[in-house]
């Protein structure tokens, strides 16, 4: 599904408790873009409120390729359910979940603000009120390049040593991934790298690999971060896909950093080598065979 369809599925499938959304053509009144007119025949039982509309503004981001802002408007009437009764559920179903739209990078949303409003739109006898819930969107583009690849090496490390952790960036992610305390998620990216030591046969690259750890609650994230950092510190290296080592010369962890934006584990001065010359294989000349 595309991102707007994933958002519709997530919002329309939410449990709003005693609050029942208006129905339009037999479905919950959730719309991407403007809502239909109140006089539209699609409204069931002539009830148009409460209803929800949402819009998405995307922008380019040099670090994450895609970022954006999601606006969710909750529309109610003064004598019906209050917007404040619906807003917490909107936040709950959209925050802390990783969505994987088809043909696009996985993404997640972070709540930014909620602002009430009084609409100029009104019914015959009722005033229309509502709340606009704003979310920041962050994408998780695949950062795998060429072998030896430090991001691919870190994904291999997590896959082999922490099979309970979901790796963001794989092609087989489901539509929705909700990290839990027992099954968190991780996203690895290469922030920067440069040429370090150089020899006749090998060039050593030094870079910074950042790991974003996703789990509900600061305490559960802190436990996972501590466990991962302790294990990496004991190892001192991560084996890459070509079986060569990537040395970890500096590891910095900060549990207060936002996992969506900055990432909490910074592998600074991660060092890996690339061969300057491919291995030479002597050819065999003048082959003679006897039958």
Q: Model-derived features: where do they sit?
A:
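Short, charged interaction patches at domain edges and termini
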Residues: 1-10, 59-65, 106-164, 193-206, ...
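N-terminal export/ancillary region detector
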Residues: 38-39, 73-75
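Small/polar-rich, solvent-exposed N-terminal microdomains that initiate assembly or binding
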Residues: 1-63, 96-110, 140-192, 290-291
